């Protein structure tokens, strides 16, 4: 029996680097011989920018142009080929201040299923808006096998990660969703990450170093893999993403997280910075 596609949902604090991370993971998965579809779930519709080099038309744009007649839409109307053979879709969103972005995600999945698009891929990756875990933007968790949380070594990102973990736990009550783990992005240290996972056990899949090229790649509209074609010094950075891909393709067991209460977590992370030993280390 053919193994079905693995579905991933990538979350994290706004501005933490989810889309950059997602695009590089998608290319890494493609480098491992997998057919990959990345679905951007953000009204900014810029998730796939580093794969395609431009802002592709969204599902909502296409539906509006076709008068919301699903039968008039074909896969080539909404799926764009990006770098490394990764296929790209942008859900888009309602006008600012109106409608529900989560509804748009649901309509996107519905349309892609009608087009039998999901049947064509080995991996489907949802790159989701910020750290919003309302019912709407938690919608990709309804379709995912694994959630990945992108963080750094800072208080705010880990606080957001804990809230996302709570959302995963809630969704896991009714479906086989698991947290694959944390991905540390652009951080020179991981001591606060380690402090958090000692209190809230969960895997740390990989921690990417504080390298400016990771941030710059977003502005250039290129993945690290594409940049490495002309700058071989970036190949070791690409290896981090290949490590993540290998971990995910092994289909890890994952966990149902047990997040900390907000006040408990606030005290834990605040205490980390307030301890005398920590203060001496910072002098």
UniProtKB/Swiss-Prot annotation:
GO BP, sorted A to Z: light-independent chlorophyll biosynthetic process; photosynthesis, dark reaction
Annotated InterPro entries: NifH/chlL_CS (IPR030655), NifH/frxC (IPR000392), P-loop_NTPase (IPR027417), Protochlorophyllide_ATP-bd (IPR005971)
Residues that bind ATP: 15-20, 44, 185-186
Class of this enzyme: oxidoreductase
Record's catalysed reaction(s): chlorophyllide a + oxidized 2[4Fe-4S]-[ferredoxin] + 2 ADP + 2 phosphate = protochlorophyllide a + reduced 2[4Fe-4S]-[ferredoxin] + 2 ATP + 2 H2O
Enzyme Commission number: 1.3.7.7
GO molecular function, one term: oxidoreductase activity, acting on the CH-CH group of donors, iron-sulfur protein as acceptor
Residue numbers binding Mg(2+): 19
Pathway it works in: Porphyrin-containing compound metabolism; chlorophyll biosynthesis (light-independent)
Cofactor(s) essential for the protein: [4Fe-4S] cluster
UniProt: [4Fe-4S] cluster binding residues: 100, 134
Keywords assigned: 4Fe-4S, ATP-binding, Chlorophyll biosynthesis, Iron, Iron-sulfur, Magnesium, Metal-binding, Nucleotide-binding, Oxidoreductase, Photosynthesis
Cofactor note: Binds 1 [4Fe-4S] cluster per dimer.
Subunit structure, as described in the record: Homodimer. Protochlorophyllide reductase is composed of three subunits; ChlL, ChlN and ChlB.
NCBIfam families registered for this protein in UniProt: DPOR_bchL
Function field: Component of the dark-operative protochlorophyllide reductase (DPOR) that uses Mg-ATP and reduced ferredoxin to reduce ring D of protochlorophyllide (Pchlide) to form chlorophyllide a (Chlide). This reaction is light-independent. The L component serves as a unique electron donor to the NB-component of the complex, and binds Mg-ATP.
Family label: Belongs to the NifH/BchL/ChlL family.
Protein name: Light-independent protochlorophyllide reductase iron-sulfur ATP-binding protein
Lineage per the UniProt record: Bacteria, Bacillati, Cyanobacteriota, Cyanophyceae, Synechococcales
């Amino acid at each position: 029996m053919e193994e079905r596609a693995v579905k991933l949902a990538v979350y994290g604090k706004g501005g933490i680097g989810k889309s950059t991370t997602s695009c590089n993971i998608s290319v890494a998965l493609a480098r491992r011989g997998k057919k990959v579809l990345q679905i951007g779930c953000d009204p900014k519709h810029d998730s796939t920018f580093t794969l395609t080099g431009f802002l592709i038309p969204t599902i909502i744009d296409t539906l509006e142009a076709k008068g919301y007649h699903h039968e008039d839409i074909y896969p080539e109307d909404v799926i764009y080929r990006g770098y490394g053979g990764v296929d790209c879709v942008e859900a888009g969103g309602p006008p600012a201040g109106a409608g529900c972005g989560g509804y748009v995600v649901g309509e996107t999945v519905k349309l892609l299923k009608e087009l039998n698009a999901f049947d064509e891929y080995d991996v489907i990756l949802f790159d989701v808006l910020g750290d919003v875990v309302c019912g709407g933007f938690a919608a990709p968790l309804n379709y995912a096998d694994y959630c990945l949380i992108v963080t750094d070594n800072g208080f705010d990102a880990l606080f957001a990660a804990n809230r996302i973990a709570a959302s995963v736990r809630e969704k896991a009550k009714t479906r086989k969703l698991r947290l694959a783990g944390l991905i540390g992005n652009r951080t020179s240290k991981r001591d606060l990450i380690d402090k958090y996972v000692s209190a809230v056990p969960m895997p740390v899949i990989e921690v990417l170093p504080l390298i400016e090229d990771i941030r710059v790649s977003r502005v250039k509209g290129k993945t690290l893999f594409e940049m490495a074609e002309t700058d071989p010094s970036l190949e070791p950075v690409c290896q981090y993403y290949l490590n993540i891909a290998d971990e995910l393709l092994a289909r890890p067991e994952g966990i149902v997280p047990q997040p900390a209460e907000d006040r408990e977590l606030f005290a834990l992370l605040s205490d980390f910075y307030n301890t005398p030993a920590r203060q001496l280390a910072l002098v």
